[in-house]
Amino acid sequence: MVGLLAGCVSPIALNRAVIAYDDAVTDALSQQLLINIARAYHRQPIHFTGVSNIAATFSFQANAGAMPSPGGLAGASIMPIFGGTFAENPTISIVPIEGEDFTQRLLTPFPQNKLTLLLRQRYDVDLLLRMMAQEVRLFQSPHYEIYRNSPRDTANYEMFRRVVLHLSAIQDDNKLYAEPLPLIHTWTIPARAIEAEGFQALQKEFSVRHDPISNTYTLRKHTAGPILITNYDPALLSDEERDQLNDMADDWDVSDIAFDIRADHYGGAWPMRGVFRLRSFHSILGFLGKAIGADAGYHVDKDVRTPPILNDENPDLTMELEISRIPPSEADISVRWNDRFYAVKTTGPYARWNRDAFQLLFLLFQMTVTDIPRVGVPSITIAK
């Protein structure tokens, strides 16, 4: 019976501990995100502290005994006694994000593959680009026109918003692609330059074709080029079109993501070609913080050439926050900083949008995670 008692208690304690620690870590990070948006609004330094390790040691002790039963026959009746004690000793290691880790996680712009990964999770491209992109560069031959994602610059901001609304409308109709540009590299070499062993090695990496007239081999290799947002399947492009887009990509940075909207496909009433330049996480927090004050977003109508947008979803703000002197009663999570409570607004017509925006912010922070130094202990140990 004693062993059974200890065996039943330990799994229950473990389950509760795992869930409790998971909730605590998630809430702590969520509150840090809100606090740092508030810090950005007040032009205070942004700082994060990460939980690198949680170790919890559980001790279970059970005992048993017997005593005369009250009211018994002068001790002739014995009553068993069972008891036990439970002790928990948690150890939590926290590490401030600083130095080179701060530079890599918070100051380095997001690479294009991070945005593509989120697009494949079916996040709204409008939400993604409004939060992650600092500007759009529209190609107007022979140069680019730059439109910044800053509400303070009215003309730039409104063009930026119209471009991302156009992409969102294409996505709503399931006609938006975000795929690596398929490239084919071709080389022609004399047949006499290849020996038998070399020929076998080439066949492992290239498709090889022999031309008996010129006695040459043509080598072809398929590679994945830069990621491209389009309203058509990039695999259908001709070799010449792929080469043209690849030549343009030579001027792009790893934090740039290009788009090519063509006239003969859905959304083609407004053909455009250009590049979005992505922000760093530090810049995203600054953008959201400024939106609390004078740099708040505002309503921008879609372009007349843009197809209908699903449910006419077009919030003024990328993520709306509530600020109050008392704890907000309907907020999912809030944090107190400098005698004010900050929370994501989860009421009204854009409650879902705001929740999605905060979830996206949480994911973006997780996507910056590097290896956090860990103490050499297991996550949870159980001792009985």
Pin down the residues of each PLM region.
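C-terminal motif of bacterial Sec signal peptides marking the signal peptidase cleavage site
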Residues: 4-7
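N-terminal amphipathic/basic membrane-interacting segments and domains
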Residues: 9-384
